[in-house]
């Protein structure tokens, strides 16, 4: 039959012709015919071959499902968000369309008629209900970033069982709500900043297990890294509840647990809704890696109202922006009119009384008619 002939041609192309071509012109190069693929049994299983994992998003399972999913190589998984408001203004210039269920917003959705509802359901479950359209966009981007960051960290901690993780997707071919980490116009979503850090050569990563907080360090370096590990349990106000320091030697090309603490004993009589953990690893060469962990869903955390102090200094190509807050500030977002700029960092967690600097590259001129401080 025609169908059987097509299958034969495809199998011959991928399983005979292409591997022979690769072997001829690039001897020694490993050949993998497709994705997902397994040389033994069905593809997309957790213990053989590579896996496309869509239980989260596609299967509508909770985001923390990423923590327990396993694969030798995650070759596809993702979570959707809307693009930046300035991108949306290009295809929805009328504020009357600024509703995720408007015709124009539904039309600019990569995953069909149910996808916007799916985004909203996940968002309300994790963050609560936004008070307006732009808050929805901002919180949705944080949610996407948190979800994919969680997945990448879990995959890297599972090294060497899992030796690869590729999120879907990097960019868009039209302005749309999608799984991308950069939108059609190249504007970075929160996810792009988060995965950049999650893929650094060294990752310090927390993991809750059996009532303990385990601290893993994952290294892709080919040499050992003599380092100092710092763990701080803090209230959002800045009060330190407990802290630990430990000199560690990070093994090359490895994932290993370097610290563990019993949370029931440590946090008894404390309200975990206003507590977070700050992790910091400093190598002898001065390289710094950090992470933040919360004990509740974002909507259940008791975030304080904060005042963010800012200073701006002119640098080549733009400005250096310094930010500091007396209290913890989650996901601080910086934008300029039209958002025609490149930022070295964004969607940042500001630790109490800790200065953060970022570069803002833009051709816009700076004037200062507004107060230096921002309340949020």
Located regions from the model:
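Aromatic/hydrophobic beta-strand junction motif of beta-rich domains
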Residues: 215-220, 321-325, 360
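Active-site neighborhood of glycoside hydrolase catalytic domains
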Residues: 2-38
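Single conserved hydrophobic/aromatic residue that forms the stacking wall/gate
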Residues: 1-4, 8, 366-376
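C-terminal accessory/binding modules appended to enzymatic or scaffolding proteins
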Residues: 307-348
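Beta-strand-rich binding/interaction modules
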Residues: 213-249, 258, 276-278, 329-337
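Intrinsically disordered, low-complexity Pro/Gly/Ser/Thr-rich segments with frequent PxxP/GP/PP motifs
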Residues: 239-270, 340-364
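Terminal connector regions
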Residues: 264-302, 364-368
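Substrate-binding clefts and catalytic carboxylate motifs of secreted carbohydrate-active enzymes
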Residues: 22-23, 33-35, 55-223
